[in-house]
């Protein structure tokens, strides 16, 4: 197992959750969410995060239907990942993210009740869960 740094994204039309993790430990930590306008992020904010954390790989969550089929937001998340690759020349992989938002809310609620359920916090923890699930899938 290598010690690559990996950045995870939870794509949304209003907010994009971000997390950073290390392959060596298989764990991630949520970073601040990036605001999006109808799914379009401020690319300068993403550029700053990439320069600060210098990840070796990006993982974008794919919001699939429960039966595994794609929906409109799935197509938009895939397009976001492709744009990350095109703009920043970073390797991008995709990860099924079904139920990560529900899991993120449950984790945050356990830690701090309703006050912990701020949108940016949920998105960041969702990105963390996507990232950790991707690493678990790779290295079990």
From Swiss-Prot:
E.C. number(s) listed in UniProt: 3.1.-.-
Leader peptide range in chain numbering: none
CC per GO annotation: cytosol
UniProt KW keywords: Cytoplasm, Hydrolase, Nuclease, Ribosome biogenesis
Main localization, broad class: cytoplasm
Keyword field contains Nuclease: yes
Gene Ontology MF annotations: nuclease activity
Annotated InterPro entries: RNaseH-like_sf, YqgF, YqgF/RNaseH-like_dom, YqgF/RNaseH-like_dom_sf
Intracellular or extracellular location(s): Cytoplasm
GO biological process, alphabetically ordered: rRNA 5'-end processing
Primary enzyme class: hydrolase
CDD domains, A to Z: YqgF
Gene3D superfamilies found in the cross-reference section: YqgF/RNase H-like domain
Function per UniProt: Could be a nuclease involved in processing of the 5'-end of pre-16S rRNA.
Family, as annotated: Belongs to the YqgF nuclease family.
PANTHER family for this protein: POLYNUCLEOTIDYL TRANSFERASE, RIBONUCLEASE H-LIKE SUPERFAMILY PROTEIN
Full protein name: Putative pre-16S rRNA nuclease
